[in-house]
Curated annotation (Swiss-Prot):
Keywords: Cytoplasm, Elongation factor, GTP-binding, Hydrolase, Magnesium, Metal-binding, Nucleotide-binding, Protein biosynthesis. Signal peptide: none annotated. InterPro entries: EF-Tu_GTP-bd, EF-Tu_GTPase, EFTu-like_2, EFTU_2, G_TR_CS, P-loop_NTPase, Small_GTP-bd, T_Tr_GTP-bd_dom. The lineage of its organism: Bacteria, Pseudomonadati, Pseudomonadota, Betaproteobacteria, Neisseriales. Belongs to the TRAFAC class translation factor GTPase superfamily. Classic translation factor GTPase family. EF-Tu/EF-1A subfamily. This is Elongation factor Tu. Gene3D superfamilies: P-loop containing nucleotide triphosphate hydrolases (3.40.50.300), Translation factors (2.40.30.10). The keyword Zinc-finger does not apply. The gene is tuf. GTP hydrolase that promotes the GTP-dependent binding of aminoacyl-tRNA to the A-site of ribosomes during protein biosynthesis.
Amino acid sequence: MAKEKFERSKPHVNVGTIGHVDHGKTTLTAALTTILAKKFGGAAKAYDQIDNAPEEKARGITINTSHVEYETETRHYAHVDCPGHADYVKNMITGAAQMDGAILVCSAADGPMPQTREHILLARQVGVPYIIVFMNKCDMVDDAELFQLVEMEIRDLLSSYDFPGDDCPIVQGSALKALEGDAAYEEKIFELATALDRYIPTPERAVDKPFLLPIEDVFSISGRGTVVTGRVERGIIHVGDEIEIVGLKETQKTTCTGVEMFRKLLDEGQAGDNVGVLLRGTKREDVERGQVLAKRGTITPHTKFKAEVYVLSKEEGGPHTPFFANYRPQFYFRTTDVTGTITLEKGVEMVMPGENVTITVELIAPIAMEEGLRFAIREGGRTVGAGVVSSVIA
C-alpha cells in the first residue's frame, strides 16, 4: 500500500497532556481523537492503544510516549501523552516532544495534587508557552461551590508559576462520559478543541526563524576555502549572507559564498537540510565542531546558566551514587562536549539518580546559548542525565 501523503493544508501545532496521575490524561487523549475524528476525520484511538506507549530514545534516554494526531476546523494537532510521571519529566526536559502548548488535566473531584504542581513548574522551566486547563471528572461532582473552589486553586497555582492564571481557558467536562457518547460531554471536547485553536498561537515555522547551523565538520578545499557541514536547525542560509561563527572562541564574522547539498551547488539551504557552507576568508583552524553558524547578532556565547535536569536512574544506566555540588561532568550541546561545574540550589545537599532538579552550571568554554536549549550530561562518554537551559546568567 502506498503511503498516504501528509496533508499540509492546515497549520500544524504540537500539544500534550500534563497533570497528576489518574486525573484522566490518557482518557482525555482518547476522547480528543475519537470525538474530533467523528466531525473532522482522522483516526480514533482507544484508551488502551494510547496507554501502552512505545519506547523511544531522546538524548540517550529511554522514554515511553504515545503520539496521536487529530484535526479541528482550522488546524492539525500532534499530541503527546505519557504513561508515567517519570516519562513526563524526561519528555519535557529532553524536548523529545516539543510542546507549543499543554493541556493540564485536573480532576474536579480531587483538585490540584503534587504532580499537578510539578508539571506546571516543569512547563515553566522548559519553556512551554501556553497552558489550557481541562477540569475532568465533572460528572462526579455535584457541588457548584466545589467547582469554583477547584478552578480558583488551579488559577492561583498557574499564576504562582508565572502563567497568566486569570486568562487561561478552563473547560469543565468528563472525558470518560464523552467517550461513552454522552452528547453534553462530547460538546465539552469540542469546546476544548476551540480553546486550543484560539488560545495557542500558530507557532513560527523553523524556516521563518533566524538562521542557525550547528557545525559538525570542517574541511578546507584548495582554491575555494573553508567548508563547514551540518544540518540547518532553523532559518535559511543564502549565498552572500553575512553570518558569524559563535561559541568556544571569540565570535568571528564571515560571509557565505556557497551552499552545497549532495554535491550540488544551491542558492540556499533551509531548516532540515544537511548542507556544506563555504565561508569567505575563514581559516580551517579558526573553526571547529561544536560552534554554530548563525545570522549575525541573533545568538551569543555564554558560560553560566541555570538549568532543569533529569538524572538517569541506576536501572536506566545512570550513576549508581548521588552527586554533590562541584560535580564536574561534560555537557553535550548540539555537537560537542564541554566540561562544566555544577552548583546546587540552596538547601539541596545532593542529587540522587532518577531525580529532576534545578542546577547552575559554569562551563570552561562558551557555547552559543539561549533559553530552551537542550543538552545531555555525560561522564566518560556515557549519558548520565539530560537538561534544558532555563535561564542564561553570563
